[in-house]
From Swiss-Prot:
It comes from Helicobacter pylori (strain J99 / ATCC 700824). It is an enzyme of class 6 (ligase). HAMAP family: GatB. PANTHER family: GLUTAMYL-TRNA GLN AMIDOTRANSFERASE SUBUNIT B MITOCHONDRIAL AND PROKARYOTIC PET112-RELATED, GLUTAMYL-TRNA(GLN) AMIDOTRANSFERASE SUBUNIT B, MITOCHONDRIAL. Heterotrimer of A, B and C subunits. Keywords: ATP-binding, Ligase, Nucleotide-binding, Protein biosynthesis. Belongs to the GatB/GatE family. GatB subfamily. GO terms for molecular function: asparaginyl-tRNA synthase (glutamine-hydrolyzing) activity; ATP binding; glutaminyl-tRNA synthase (glutamine-hydrolyzing) activity. InterPro entries: Asn/Gln-tRNA_amidoTrfase_suB/E (IPR017959), Asn/Gln-tRNA_Trfase_suB/E_cat (IPR006075), Asn/Gln_amidotransferase (IPR018027), Asn/Gln_tRNA_amidoTrase-B-like (IPR003789), GatB (IPR004413), GatB_C_1 (IPR042114), GatB_Yqey_C_2 (IPR023168), Gln-tRNA_amidoTrfase_suB_CS (IPR017958). One of its GO terms (biological process) is glutaminyl-tRNAGln biosynthesis via transamidation. This is Aspartyl/glutamyl-tRNA(Asn/Gln) amidotransferase subunit B. The gene is gatB. It comes from the Bacteria. Its EC number is 6.3.5.-.
Amino acid sequence: MPFEAVIGLEVHVQLNTKTKIFCSCSTSFGETPNSNTCPVCLGLPGALPVLNKEVVKKAIQLGTAIEAHINQYSIFARKNYFYPDLPKAYQISQFEVPIVSDGKLEIDTKEGAKIVRIERAHMEEDAGKNIHEGSYSLVDLNRACTPLLEIVSKPDMKNSEEAIAYLKKLHAIVRFIGISDANMQEGNFRCDANVSIRPKGDEKLYTRVEIKNLNSFRFIAKAIEYEIERQSVAWENGRYNEEVVQETRLFDTAKGITLSMRNKEESADYRYFKDPDLYPVFIDEKLLKEAQKINELPGAKKIRYMKDFNLKEDDANLLVSDPLLAEYFESMLNLGVKAKTSVTWLCVELLGRLKAEVTLENCGISAHALGALAKRIDEGKISGKSAKDVLDRLLEEQGGDVDTLIEQMGLSQVNDTEAIVKVIEEVLKNNADKVLEYKSGKDKLFGFFVGQAMKNLKGANPSVVNAILKEKLD
């Protein structure tokens, strides 16, 4: 029996505010455990939360980017549950009236463009972090009270490819509009996947399973694919009702399987109620208009790149996958580098040289340095082959001045036409017999003349050498 998957995603985006959502503690990552804490984020009696206005602004920006409705009145609620990393025994979140609702994202699929509806996005605080070591566990509350936006999609995705396309689009958006670093390794962008299956053509929604805390696109895809397979096999073996229950599962990255964690709670289990310590959020027109001024979105940027610079779709997609890539590209254009040259030296030459532990951000080569190198190629002052040697040196030395390196490495091309003509005439004079052979039909000798000229010139613009040689020989 053919099945189709029904997939909905809950994405937790950690906002890049300097301080936490309800207190003035720092949100910096990697600090000494429990050093960025105060009575509010420790949940001590009598401590009262105060909402960080920047969190509201960033929520509005996200809502604008996903074409959603911004609720100018929203409320905070307490989500009650007990866990060691939740010192208050409740999480401050939004339930009945979220700040953002009814959004959408358009994704590219094999069948063409598809709209994924977004039910809501709400503000909430993050929990702390449990660290399990051997037979005991530690709790680090530095992350407690860090601001999150939880973005909840409708169950509109049918396979792992669509889910990853949606996540990558959302991941790019939150970085381009500047509301989150979205560093998945640091937990800034985490995903819970709700997965169920049904016979193709059936509109009924069957038992869904939630897979928690997935923080890499590769593992998200693998977890979804495994869960679809597990549920399909259970159905075909007549054990669907026994083996597929509403529960929360974890993905074992080493074994590539999902494992049962606990029964999935319903909203009633959390006993949501309005938080009495926080006023409702009222957004006036001034704040709304101010926050709705967002950076150019990756989709619009992609269209502009293809239209204005005649880029291929694959190249444009790569450039808008990362704000820093787009920034480098535009900086190179501003230096006068041709679009095609910029793409080649940024996306092929530089990215192709970066190793797993080295990123564009920490490679040491600035957009200005890469642009200067690419511009020297456009100007004919250095050959593409020589430029690769300069790029290798820049990476090795974590930066440097391009023109100084070209000079030190003796890679400048001769562009002086008179000097090139003089050398070519000398080459032809010294090889008069081969000139006669060439003129009698041995066209392959042209490469010999080019090689001799380039050797004597010790670096010259090949296109200029070729043009002058052709003129002299023909």
